[in-house]
């Protein structure tokens, strides 16, 4: 009977305990960042296969809240919530669990390397290359998987340029 069945440990449970961005070396931080970018691009087809009108409504609410909080300390919450919802849509619990691990790393990287990321962001903004959550949401609403795939890659371009400049 299931009553005596032990709770199965989560696949990333151990990783969650050891991934502390304050004690990780730069190479490990950059590897995690690169993994996150690859994961975001890799889950595109699952998102489009599983997304419901309710999911789109929820993402619309998240995006609205993100705009409200854009310039203060709530911005990371908006970032987390938007991408956590995308991970949830895949239906894969391990992917969702990864978001809990990667979020503190992303905040740490953004803060630690702010002076290096900012000029890349400014350059991309001047060239009209910034892809926002609003842009991503529009591709989802329009069921444009190819457009979304290109847009999510561009959404993380600032980090890709940053990582390439560190090699």
Mark where each language-model region is.
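Short linear motifs at protein or domain termini
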Residues: 1-38, 45
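Short, Lys/Arg-enriched, disordered terminal segments
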Residues: 3, 165-167
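Short, structured coil/loop segments at alpha-helix boundaries
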Residues: 25, 92-96, 122
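Conserved amphipathic alpha-helical segments that form helical-bundle/coiled-coil interaction surfaces
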Residues: 32-114, 132-135, 147-159, 166
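Short helix-coil transition/hinge motifs at the ends and kinks of transmembrane helices
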Residues: 115-124
């Amino acid at each position: 009977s299931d009553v005596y069945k032990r709770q199965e440990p989560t696949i990333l449970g151990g990783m969650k305990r050891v991934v502390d961005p304050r004690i990780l070396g730069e190479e490990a931080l950059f590897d995690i960042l690169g993994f996150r970018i690859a994961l975001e691009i890799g889950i595109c087809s699952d998102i489009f296969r599983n997304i419901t009108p309710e999911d789109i409504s929820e993402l619309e609410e998240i995006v609205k809240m993100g705009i409200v909080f854009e310039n203060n300390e709530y911005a990371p919450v908006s970032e987390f919530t938007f991408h956590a919802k995308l991970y949830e849509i895949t239906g894969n619990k391990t992917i969702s669990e990864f978001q809990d691990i990667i979020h503190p790393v992303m905040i740490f990287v953004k803060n630690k390397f702010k002076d290096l990321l900012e000029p890349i962001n400014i350059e991309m903004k001047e060239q009209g290359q910034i892809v926002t959550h609003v842009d991503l949401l529009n591709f989802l609403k329009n069921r444009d998987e190819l457009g979304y795939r290109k847009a999510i890659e561009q959404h993380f371009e600032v980090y890709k340029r940053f990582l390439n400049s560190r090699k």
